Amino acid sequence: MIFDSHMHSKFSTDSNMNILDAIAVGKEKNIGIIITDHMDLDYPVKDEFKFDVPTYFNEYEKYRSSNVKLGIEIGLTTNTVSENEAIAKNYDFDFVLGSIHAVKGLDIYVDYVHQGYNKKQFFTYYFEDMLKCVQLHDNFDSLSHIDYPCRYCKFDNNEILVSEFKDILAEIFTTLINKGKVLELNTARLHVPESNKAMRDIYKLYMDLGGKYVTIGSDAHSPLNI
């Protein structure tokens, strides 16, 4: 069965999706679903993008089945390695996404995109932080939405081009592969022709380096996007 392994319910600050609606869409589309609510311990706004894990399991455990899984999306930063490891280790998650939502301590969506970097600087700093995080963390199964900043940056061409960032992408992918981690194929921007082409090149590099598997995730925050 194919799983949509990246979606957010009411336990995420930026979503109010009801798990029952997500389950219904999964049944309608004949796919499995994995709930992966946000846990960004280093998020600059106190209490946002964090949730009470015991309450999450107390409320959702009754829905767990062969095609409904309970996961988490952990924001990877160099400042929260031990705390992130503890969350992943101490709770019975079926699946853990690792994500880069901040660069140089700045939230990508709120602050980082407004720092005035040119495209080369913008993505180089992003990938440098990503490489450090995947080297330091062992708590995740799949690295999510590698093109996340492309949603918000404002360059003439927002896409990640392998020709521009091949060396550091190769370091990241080799680290993932050597650790037994995989890369997520995030579907949120695949409808954009330029994104589709750029992502094909990125995943070809991943495959050429020995990557055998991907997880598929919509990053849905509402049932319509599953």
Task: Go through each PLM region and give its residues.
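An N-terminally biased module of ancient metal coordination in phosphate/nucleic-acid-related enzymes
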Residues: 1-78, 90, 94, 152-154, ...
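A short acidic, amphipathic alpha-helical/loop segment
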Residues: 21, 83-87, 201-205
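Extended substrate/RNA-proximal surfaces in nucleic-acid metabolism proteins
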Residues: 47-178
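Residues at alpha-helix caps and immediate loop-helix transition turns in enzyme cores, especially N-
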Residues: 15-18, 80-83, 195-199
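Active-site-adjacent C-terminal substructures of enzyme catalytic domains
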Residues: 163-226
